[in-house]
């Protein structure tokens, strides 16, 4: 492709270092031009959160393929009103999973349902000391929060389930 340099031409790719560089030399085949209907900021917000969400969703889909006929159905998404979480809810819903979204924002329940969450749970149900053993509820989990919320999601994941961890905004414990 023919790439120009200058204001308004912002290109992105998530494979190489140098995202904060003012100038970087990279192979032109690795570049994607920012769509004209998005600002540079919007493009990067979607690019970073969207890429992370997509990788987490693909991990769940790949696990399903390994189960040889066992269907991954119930998927939990923590931090569901954040960038990665909300995009994960949308992607997983489009993939056909029953998504349960976890949020601490009660005023966002309608929003989460509008983007594909079948159920919405308050994070208070997860932000507590986990039991050593709990009932298996989830075939898959996308966790963007970490800490006690992740610990509870782990003990509630069914045997042969998959957990994709891509954040620790709550705690690194």
Name each region found by the language model:
Residues 1-11:
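Single conserved hydrophobic/aromatic residue that forms the stacking wall/gate
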Residues 6, 27, 115-116, 159:
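Short, structured coil segments at secondary-structure junctions
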Residues 9-79:
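NAD(P)H dinucleotide-binding glycine-rich loop of Rossmann-like/cofactor-binding domains
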Residues 50-51, 79-86, 146:
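Glycine-rich NAD(P) Rossmann-fold beta1-alpha1 loop
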Residues 77, 93-152:
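Adenosine-nucleotide cofactor-binding segment
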Residues 85-94:
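Surface-exposed amphipathic alpha-helices with a cationic face
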Residues 148-173:
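Glycine-rich phosphate-binding loop and adjacent beta-alpha segment
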């Amino acid at each position: 492709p023919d790439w120009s340099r200058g204001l308004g031409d912002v290109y992105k790719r998530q494979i190489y270092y140098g995202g904060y560089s003012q100038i970087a030399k990279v192979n032109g085949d690795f570049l994607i031009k920012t769509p004209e209907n998005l600002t540079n900021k919007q493009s990067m917000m979607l690019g970073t959160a969207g890429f992370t969400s997509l990788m987490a969703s693909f991990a769940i889909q790949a696990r399903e393929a390994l189960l040889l006929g066992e269907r991954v159905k119930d998927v939990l998404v923590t931090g569901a009103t954040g960038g990665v979480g909300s995009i994960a809810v949308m992607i997983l819903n489009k993939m056909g999973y029953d998504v349960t979204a976890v949020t601490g924002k009660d005023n966002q329940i309608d929003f989460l349902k509008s983007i594909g969450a079948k159920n919405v749970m308050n994070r208070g149900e997860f932000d507590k000391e986990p039991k050593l053993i709990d009932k298996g509820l989830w075939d898959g989990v996308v966790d963007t929060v970490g800490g006690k919320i992740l610990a509870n999601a782990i003990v509630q994941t069914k045997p042969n389930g998959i957990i994709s961890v891509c954040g620790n905004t709550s705690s690194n414990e």
